[in-house]
Amino acid sequence: MLASMAQALSLRLERTLELAGALTLAVLLATVTASVALRYFAASGFTGAEEAASWLLVTLASIGLPLASTAKGLRIDLFEGRPAPSDGRDQRPSARGELIIDNRGTKPFSSENRFVPQDLRTIFSGAITLVACIVVISGSGKAALDLGGVSPSLGLSEGLRPAMLSAGGVLAIVAILLRHVADGRLVAFVSMLAIAVGLHSADGAVPPMDLESPSFMLCCLALLTILAGTPLPHAFIAPAYVTVAFGAPMPEEAMAAATLSGLSRYLLTAIPFFLLVGALLTASGIASDLVCFAAALVGHRRAGLGQTVLLTGVLFSGASGSSIANAAFGSAAFMPQLTAHGTPPERAGALIAAVSVLDNIIPPSIAFLILAAAADLSTGKLLAGGFVAGLLMAATLAIAIHVNGATTARTARASAGESRRFGVRALPAFGLGIIVVAGIRAGVVSPTEAAALAAAYTLVAAFLKRTAGQEIGAAFGQSARETAAILLLIGSAAPFAFLIAVDGVAAQVSSLAGWLGSNPFLVIAALNLLLLGVGLFLDIGAAILLFAPLTLPVAVSAGIDPIHFGVILVVNLMIGGLTPPVGILVQTVGNASGVPVVALFAASRPYLLALLSALALLSFSAALVAFF
């Protein structure tokens, strides 16, 4: 009885939060779109638009914190070899965004091949998650009390923003409690809460040890919590707090302030809009129109179905900006067709996963937006560099598909009339490329404005396609959930980055790299090996936030252009989506198709080789330019 009641309350809380997130995202879109329209058509402005957007981002993150604390896809589970098992709710893998924030989860898996007992890992991970929630509640609460004054444009108390985050932390603990009661694991929750309260209390009571480099302890603790399956934002917050006991100069309220500052930057407003574009494209059927158009162009050639998957991926990349979006969409759209025409399931799934890499390379790209915010680089230049890199990677994949085309069927040649008809139906998607890439490159609109216009454009197209209101609402809710996940990851990494900067780790890394000399070939080769290794374990968002500030100075000191290296960094980390043990793109396809991930990893090798070849060409050109 108690479990059933908790299950019902948990579902109601989840749906209420998703609805609140959808409404917040709708208000955010209306605010930014109205500001752009007034500026260009009425030669006026919307006073406080940027400030309002910043407040709405904090609201989204606060709403998403309870969902992030219970989400199974927002963590890395190396011991299972695939995403952490869920409680068996409806199976619906996330379709947008590099970070899955979907606690509907995947099927439960057997307990074989675990290297440490599941219960111990669960309790440890849960305790760390609760420590992070307590830190958010306490630190944000103190910041809310300390902050004075009001917002200059909105007239709201400045203490309201940290108060919202503190409330999100309270709801997160409630969500975790309901989940454990629903699963009949109340004792486990009490154990985790006791450990968390003890750690939080002890950290404030024990005199600091004053280590010479607290950031080293910080990195070790963060890596341990990440590998234990702790949700990524919590895996940054809790170690940063614990490191205070080792001399880190950052109290709770300072951590809360840094987190708020990190997740409320106006540039990040583009992220929910690009995620919404991908969701609306799928809901409206425009993504399916892209498939038909791609099939009409290349489906009749050697390995025609494979080339259709690739061309659709390239076209969809220019609209969604999300590799998870393409992997989920491709699994549903292409897997049945490829297997029905004789392609082995593991090869079909590997192809879909490999093509999905392009979505975070070809603009718009969520990864480049995160990198621009983390490293203070030009968003427009990064997107332009990603466009060139994406086309090069697509060319190498096309060659790999052609060489392996004996097992991939082709479709009948489309007539000229059919090609024109499919092209006309796909025109709405091509308009997005003009708005985003051309608008930013020409300097007509900022990245955030381009993203808002693209989302508004896609919303109008969805209405014109007579998309059901329920599907549009679901697209807003899904995008809001995933936006919250990304914002929380970026915000939680801000205290982490501050502590690393205070310790001068970037300078230490640069000095350690001094033995390579100023030879750009050696530097870029060493950095490639490092980033490929990082991509084996970390999600791209976390990897960018942690390693961009460390590796970028090394590359610049060797004479490598920072934009060029930024593109290489993202390409390296995206290739990690195909490599074990994590391989998030392979995991997504495996969960959607039911193909064992071990078979998918093995079948991905030809495409992995093709992408590594493209990386070598990009790296060689960067080193060559720096050399001369």
Per-range role (PLM):
Residues 146-153, 162, 185-628:
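Alpha-helical transmembrane segments of multi-pass membrane transport proteins
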Residues 1-82, 86-211, 488:
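Alpha-helical transmembrane segments and membrane-interface helix-loop junctions
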